[in-house]
Regions:
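Helix-loop junctions at the membrane-solvent interface of multi-pass transporters
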Residues: 94-95, 169-171, 192, 216-217, ...
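Small-residue-rich segments of transmembrane alpha-helices in multi-pass membrane proteins
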Residues: 83-92, 203-216, 263-266, 326-341
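Intramembrane alpha-helical segments
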Residues: 67, 71-72, 111, 141-228, ...
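Multi-pass membrane catalytic core of lipid/isoprenoid biosynthesis enzymes
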Residues: 86, 106-113, 129-179, 254-294, ...
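Cytosolic, membrane-interface loops and tails of multi-pass inner-membrane proteins
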Residues: 44-68, 121, 125-148, 242-265, ...
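Glycine-biased, low-complexity coil/linker segments
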Residues: 28-39
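Membrane-embedded alpha-helical segments that form the functional core of polytopic membrane enzymes
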Residues: 86-90, 94-127, 137, 161-165, ...
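Extended hydrophobic alpha-helices typical of membrane-associated regions
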Residues: 63-68, 281, 285-346
């Protein structure tokens, strides 16, 4: 869009770190900028270490040098994404159980979440390697930094997919069919930010598919409760990933990448309340459909408090705070899991 190009040029020319020949960096807060994609869009303030690769972390301290780029491709250094992928699967298992969920299934889904989240991130890095080189947060990732080649990343992707397939084919056939059905969504998600301002919707469709597979892994068939659980998870993901996307909105606007953060701009906060309210409503309907008891509603209330706190307190122009609020969704995952399990007993 013409307005976006103009804004991108203004940001580039007014920040020496973004002039030609300089590495990309975050832009200073120079007041609210405007674009067709988001009224009153503020360019985020700079902060000391925008890169999501942190030298001296446990990967560098404890892993062999040759393995470190692969650990980072799989995001083993940043497990929050694995948790957010894993929880819907655990919820589905717990919702289908008549009491305590099967620990063997929980462990199997944990292995699947680690490998498939790693595979998804590797695929995303392959697709976005040229964009990532221009974004302050991602420019030091293994592909744009040259730590691995494209072929090495592709082979690592196949290795992870093989492990994921082994996990999937250890389940019943209903779960296998669902796992195969989601492959199209997994393959198309990395390209959605090029064509729509709502890639977060596609991420939600992907990340919460485990709710369906978790249920069928126990029961062998789909039903209304996991569908409602899945719907709630989609809205939850749209909310937390919109917060996450606000970290990169300055760079995204400059290089032409789309996100819900750009679409909503200064209207993000009220929309986060809407997304999270929709998630809680769908989860409540799932609990009703599954016949869960009082303790489920107590846990759901705790999740509601946490989800209300995020949009009420998030500083959407502070990338560090956006990351903190995004990571806080692990608490929602645990609260919902505890609520579903406890709801079978009281």
């Amino acid at each position: 869009m013409a307005v976006e190009k103009e804004l991108g040029a203004r940001v580039t020319l007014t920040h020496p770190a973004l002039r030609p020949g300089s590495p990309p960096s975050r832009t200073p807060g120079e007041g609210a900028e405007r674009s067709e994609a988001g009224e009153g869009l503020a360019v985020p303030a700079a902060f000391s270490d925008p890169s999501d690769i942190h030298h001296g972390d446990w990967v560098e301290r404890h892993l062999p040098t040759w393995s470190q780029p692969y650990a980072r491709l799989a995001r083993l250094d940043r497990p929050i994404g694995t948790w957010l992928l894993l929880f819907p699967g655990w919820w589905g298992i717990a919702l289908a159980a008549s009491g305590w969920p099967d620990p063997a299934l929980l462990l199997l889904f944990a292995l699947g979440a680690v490998t498939m989240r790693g595979a998804g991130c590797t695929l995303n890095d392959i697709a976005d390697r040229h964009y990532d080189a221009q974004v302050a947060r991602t420019r030091l990732r293994p592909l744009p930094s040259g730590a691995v080649t494209l072929w090495q990343a592709a082979l690592f992707l196949l290795f992870q997919l093989a492990i994921g397939a082994a996990v999937l084919f250890s389940l019943n056939w209903a779960s296998v069919l669902l796992g195969v059905a989601v492959l199209g969504l997994i393959g198309t998600y990395p390209f959605m930010k090029r064509v729509t301002y709502w890639p977060q919707v596609f991420l939600g469709l992907n990340f919460n598919w485990g709710a369906l597979i978790g249920w069928t892994a126990v029961t062998g068939e789909l039903a209304l409760p996991p569908l409602l659980l899945y719907l709630g998870g989609i809205f939850w993901t749209i909310g937390y990933d919109t917060i996450y996307a606000h970290q990169d909105k300055g760079d995204d606007l400059r290089i032409g990448v789309k996100s819900s953060a750009l679409a909503l701009g200064s209207h993000t906060r009220p929309w986060l309340f809407v997304f999270y309210a929709a998630a809680l409503t769908a989860w409540a309907m799932a609990g009703l459909a599954a016949g869960l008891g009082f303790l489920f509603w107590l846990g759901l209330a705790g999740s509601a408090v946490q989800l209300a706190w995020q949009p009420a307190c998030v500083a959407i122009d502070d990338p560090a705070d956006c990351l903190r609020k995004f990571r806080s969704n692990r608490a929602v995952g645990w609260l919902m899991l505890a609520a579903i399990v406890a709801g079978h007993f009281a």
